[in-house]
């Protein structure tokens, strides 16, 4: 090894070929930038003020697609996870169903657990960290018992999972907030609501009243109902909200 270390190699840029800026296609133009809000503080003015770039452009495209699908009588499928419910967006979805915009709901089991608890007792979303520490996470007696009993009845009667839970809620007269339930709204409006369970991944599955066969049967019925709806999506829209895995 020589006493004098060699200098690190450096790339030679002398043969690089550049291109004129005028010949380059740009993804962002001056006209695409946002505009500060003026005197008009309406929501439509806010949307119009957004930049025509990336997610703002995508958001406008989604809105336009939903409007076009609704006006032409096409299907709008809203697939969702539990966070859509637990972060307080239920009233918006119910409003969209009432307006005839959302024509089918599909969710995992987490979403209907939160929906059931909100309608039944007016609260949901336990403290996971504290519950794991003392072993009580997912151990709510009434939630697990009532929902599993409804699913078992639904399996015997050939119902889907979503239909079974909606019927169980509808039969009760002691609900804290029935007006906040997606299950009840879908039942009232005749909007399909299919539930696609992940066996072993939802808190009611560890309850002694859980019946894996009943959960699987009713969820499979809902899968078939979802597939039967899919032809309506020709020219329609599929939304996936808050479910990065199951839906």
Predicted regions and their residues:
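Metallocofactor- and cofactor-centric catalytic cores in central/energy metabolism, strongly enriched
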Residues: 2-156, 163-247
């Amino acid at each position: 090894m020589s006493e004098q270390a060699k200098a690190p190699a450096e790339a030679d840029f002398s043969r690089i070929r550049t291109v004129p800026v005028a010949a380059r296609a740009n993804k962002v133009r001056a006209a695409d930038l946002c505009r500060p809000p003026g005197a008009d503080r309406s929501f439509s003015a806010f949307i119009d003020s957004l930049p025509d770039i990336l997610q703002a452009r995508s958001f406008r495209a989604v809105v336009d697609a939903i409007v076009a699908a609704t006006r032409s009588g096409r299907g709008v499928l809203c697939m969702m996870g539990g966070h859509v419910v637990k972060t307080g967006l239920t009233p918006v979805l119910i409003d969209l169903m009432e307006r005839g915009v959302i024509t089918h709901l599909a969710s995992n089991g987490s979403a209907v657990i939160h929906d059931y608890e909100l309608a039944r007792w007016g609260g949901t979303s336990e403290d996971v960290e504290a519950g794991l520490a003392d072993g009580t996470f997912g151990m709510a007696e009434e939630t697990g018992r009532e929902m599993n009993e409804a699913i078992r009845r639904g399996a015997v009667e050939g119902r889907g999972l979503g239909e079974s839970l909606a019927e169980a809620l509808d039969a009760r007269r002691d609900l804290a907030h029935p007006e906040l339930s997606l299950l009840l709204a879908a039942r009232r409006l005749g909007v399909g609501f299919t539930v696609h369970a992940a066996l072993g991944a939802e808190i009611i599955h560890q309850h002694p009243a859980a019946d894996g066969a009943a959960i699987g049967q009713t969820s499979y019925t809902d899968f078939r109902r979802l597939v039967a709806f899919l032809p309506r999506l020709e020219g329609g829209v599929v939304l996936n909200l808050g479910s990065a895995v199951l839906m």
